[in-house]
Amino acid sequence: MVKIAFGSIGDSFSVASIKAYVAEFIATLLFVFAGVGSAIAYNKLTSDAALDPAGLVAVAVAHAFALFVGVSMAANVSGGHLNPAVTLGLAVGGNITILTGLFYWIAQCLGSTVACLLLKFVTNGLSVPTHGVAAGMDAIQGVVMEIIITFALVYTVYATAADPKKGSLGVIAPIAIGFIVGANILAAGPFSGGSMNPARSFGPAVASGDFSQNWIYWAGPLIGGALAGFIYGDVFITAHAPLPTSEDYA
């Protein structure tokens, strides 16, 4: 049974909810600053050479470490989503309301955009790399790739963080989430870029002014996240605690 709840304005603008939005903004900003910053640093060190295996590993590790830290720092305030696809997946499973989830999206996209604009400023106008599918691939292949890897990410979030039966496994949730993102970037980076995160792709698109393929990184991750939320949140988790009231973020 689908557990989606729309929510209310009162809950979405409670003090706890506003704190959650600020936490998502800050954590996403820091994650994207480190992740995109690693790609900019690679381009500078190699004079914009094509990404080689060592560079791919470096970028994947930077994203994995930064996400691990970002999720850890926001987990106790907002749940540590840092990603619209994660938020949607959790909404499909009834862990957050649609209305509050939309404000999470805004906070995440703003955090990513500010991070990329800051990077452009502090690097004296160096190019901010955007996600795009590799030569020889079409957009549909890129969408399917992003669906698969985002499904893996959100499924991991459910298994290690959202499942009420997780027990002590929840302690390692940020590590597991960082690991799956790093692994997926290693697998998908040369093909779709390995985004898994519409906000992560949106910020660079704003900073560079290039939205030509940005839709791929909304469609794929959101579909993958929703599928994972439905399968784990609505099929595997048969009982669900009521959504929190305005005393907590909704």
Swiss-Prot record:
Main location: membrane
Tissue specificity note: Expressed in mature seeds and dark-grown seedlings.
Membrane topology: Multi-pass membrane protein
Keyword Repeat: yes
Keywords: Membrane, Repeat, Transmembrane, Transmembrane helix, Transport, Vacuole
Coiled coil (UniProt feature): none
Gene3D superfamilies: Glycerol uptake facilitator protein
CDD domains attached to this UniProt entry: MIP (cd00333)
GO cellular component annotations of the record: plant-type vacuole membrane
Domain of life, per lineage: Eukaryota
Transmembrane segment boundaries: 20-42, 55-77, 97-119, 140-162, 172-194, 215-237
Keyword Membrane applies: yes
Motif interval(s): NPA 1: 83-85
Matching InterPro entries: Aquaporin-like (IPR023271), Aquaporin_transptr (IPR034294), MIP (IPR000425), MIP_CS (IPR022357)
Subcellular location: Vacuole membrane
Motif interval(s): NPA 2: 197-199
A GO MF term: water channel activity
Family in the record: Belongs to the MIP/aquaporin (TC 1.A.8) family. TIP (TC 1.A.8.10) subfamily.
Domain notes: Aquaporins contain two tandem repeats each containing three membrane-spanning domains and a pore-forming loop with the signature motif Asn-Pro-Ala (NPA).
Functional note: Channel protein in tonoplast. These proteins may allow the diffusion of amino acids and/or peptides from the vacuolar compartment to the cytoplasm.
Name assigned to this protein: Probable aquaporin TIP-type
This protein's encoding gene: DIP
